[in-house]
Structures are given as C-alpha cells and as structure tokens.
C-alpha cells in the first residue's frame, strides 16, 4: 500500500519500522517540528523524524494542520491508499482524512473506549487497571472515538512502570497496524458509549506527592509518572524526585510524610512507602543508600511540608 505515516515520539517508531519492513510504500512522514531537548536544550528533530530520515523517507513538520490549505492540497495530491497515525500530537482536520474505507487508521495505547486522550499509558497505571493494550481504530474527527478494528492486551502488575508498558505497547502497535492493513475484511466495531474515560495531558504538578494518600496510590503515581513528568516531594524546601518506591507494612498512626526509619520509609495516609530511588537537584537518580550517604535524613523528618 501507498501510505502516509504521522507520528512524533518514541512510541510511534516501532510502527513506522514495522510498516516499512512489511513492504509498504511510505510516501511521506509527518512529525511535529524539532524542539529544544535535554540539559543543553539543543533543538533536535523528534524520534519519528529521525527514524524516517534514516529510512530515506521524506519528512514534513508543519506547526499546524487546521486551516493549512497548502498542506491539505499537498496531502490530497499524494494519492494514498491509507494514512496511519500513532501519537502524532496534532488532530487531523476533515480535509486530511482520506475518504477511502478503512484507510484512516490510528494506533492508540489503550483498550478503547477506556483512556481516550493524551496520556493513556500513565492513566492505566494510576488507576490500578488490571490490563492495558493497543487499539487500532478508524479515525474520525472526534478524540479517539472511531470504530475499532483490532485490539491487543497486556496484563498490568504491581511492578509495571510507564517505561516498560510504553515499550510493550509500542512493539504491539507495530504488529497490530501491519495486521490491520493486511486484512481489509476486518469488521470495524463502533466504540460503546459505556466505559469511556479520558486521560488528560500531564503537567509537572501531577507529579507532586500528597503524603495523605494511600501508599499503594503513591506507588502507582511513581510508576506511572517516571520519567515524565516525574514524581517529587520536598525536603527542607529542596525538591527531591522519586524514581522508585515500595509499599510496605508499617505503623498507622504516624503523621503522613514523616520519615520512620533510616531506610527512608515514609508514613502515608494509609500504609507506608519505602523510597528506593531518589534524585536531588543537579545530580542523577541514585539508590536510596547512596543518597543517604550524601544527605542524611533523620527519623522524624517531614517530607513535603
């Protein structure tokens, strides 16, 4: 098939590679424009942009698609069989949704209609879901509301992190989009209205730890929001990022946020949480024992106050 591929972050790269390896003609790749990244804030192309260039595929990086009539005309002139979207980050206007049946496909990292929106991987972990997955859906002008073609499922465990789930679902998305294009007879199933939920775009403030919450919920927050936007608390006014933690049994009458022992076990609203990976300003993420050698934290210290 002659395709356009639209994607931006690392999540979309396996789908691009899978389509290329399956022998599809990828006429053009759309990605969001290069942006500052890393400590030096150097302007860098997005991961999909780099992957497409490595494959020798032309790349377009418009800053907007709505009311971009020149881009609409270019897109129509491509004479595509299908357009595949995976975490592109811009909503396609109607003028860029090719009318061919089954040819407007999106790779979405959730079991729709649960977790439509921008952050489905993190939302599934935050909510304590038992499973997540990938849905291949036909695109319409709604937000992840189109009819579903294929789904793949993966179980979530108390050890699942956003990073591990991201990689599992990215690989699954590549396999499923190739399968969807190979079987044009797959029936599209409209999404049910019941069970629809939305995963809002994350902000840095979503990572602030509220120690009055249950230890299990805070553990989910750490696993869901590492590396972005990261979970954090404060120690004497200094921001500490928390990279990993473990809920454990502990006293129920301690003030939330109180350090209970010399292993950085912290009282929560329900239960206790042992911090196992920590980062202070200007340093890399480190194990708790290494952190404590350079920054002793006395028993009774209050975090987040």
Curated annotation (Swiss-Prot):
InterPro entries for the chain: Fmt, Formyl_trans_C, Formyl_trans_C_sf, Formyl_transf_N, Formyl_transf_N_sf, Formyl_transferase-like_C_sf, GART_AS, Met-tRNA-FMT_C
Residues holding (6S)-5,6,7,8-tetrahydrofolate: 110-113
HAMAP family, sorted: Formyl_trans
Alphabetic keyword roster: Protein biosynthesis, Transferase
Stated name of the protein: Methionyl-tRNA formyltransferase
Family membership: Belongs to the Fmt family.
UniProt catalytic activity: L-methionyl-tRNA(fMet) + (6R)-10-formyltetrahydrofolate = N-formyl-L-methionyl-tRNA(fMet) + (6S)-5,6,7,8-tetrahydrofolate + H(+)
Top-rank taxon: Bacteria
Enzyme Commission code(s) on record: 2.1.2.9
Uppermost EC category: transferase
Function recorded in the entry: Attaches a formyl group to the free amino group of methionyl-tRNA(fMet). The formyl group appears to play a dual role in the initiator identity of N-formylmethionyl-tRNA by promoting its recognition by IF2 and preventing the misappropriation of this tRNA by the elongation apparatus.
Lineage of the species this protein comes from: Bacteria, Pseudomonadati, Pseudomonadota, Alphaproteobacteria, Acetobacterales
Coiled-coil residue spans: none
Any one cellular-component term (Gene Ontology): cytosol
Any one GO molecular-function label of the UniProt entry: methionyl-tRNA formyltransferase activity
Keyword GTP-binding: no
